[in-house]
Amino acid sequence: MNMSKDASLERYYGFREVVGCTTAPQAALMAYFLKALNDTGVRGDVLEIGVYRGRSSMLFGLYLHGRRRLHLVDPGLKGDVLEELTRNLTDIAPSMDFERDVIIDMRMSQELQYDYAVQNRGQYAFIHIDGGHSMLDVYRDLQQAEKMLGEKGIVICDDFFAAGRPAVTEGVYKYLHDHPGVFKILLTGYNKAVLARADRYEEWWVRIINSLGEYLESNWRPVQIHLYNSPLEFPTLGLSERTKEQCPFGGYFEREESHALIAALSKAVGAQGNK
């Protein structure tokens, strides 16, 4: 991944007046994965469950490049809200053909039902879940995502570890507990949980170690990436902004340590495969 300034993200930063809850570091984190999907040629559309006024949708629209469609699911997408969303998307991404590239679905995500998920099996490369915030809402949205996410895709759950939305975290962990071997959490940070298919987490994990810190430093601020356990025991990485004072008991590591971690992970995975 080229670590120069990401022009699409820079453009997004310029549209600050749009109402919404997506923060600058959240946008940078999601942009990293959208750009990675584009850079590696992963096919598939973008699905957002829970749109509100479209602040994060505008970010997603910048990474379609005529090769993906943006599917927005929210019962509030009508009237003035839809007009505002349409205007904002076309303003931020003038090359976008709204009629061709954007699908508006005014149903609750649970109303998409099983048949819809089967019909769209493997269709999406990127799924952003920010719909209902109950444990059951999140659980059901992940059930849908299991069917609709492509092999190399990414799921991002919003409000993970958010103090005001504790049921979201409960829903994610309950789903992972009940469906072992489907998804693994790659990374948590800025109240986002980034999930990949369990059989693809290693390549994403290596990519994150190698390039996420540099990307965020170029496009947001210097960050710390944390790892407290063996990657095979608990591979989830933590993300926070870098501070001048470091905790002496942390699992935080600098970029130069990443090669040793990757080598250890590859060796451990190989050993498991030979058992």
Language-model segments: what does each one mean?
Residues 2-24, 31-275:
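S-adenosylmethionine/decaboxylated-SAM
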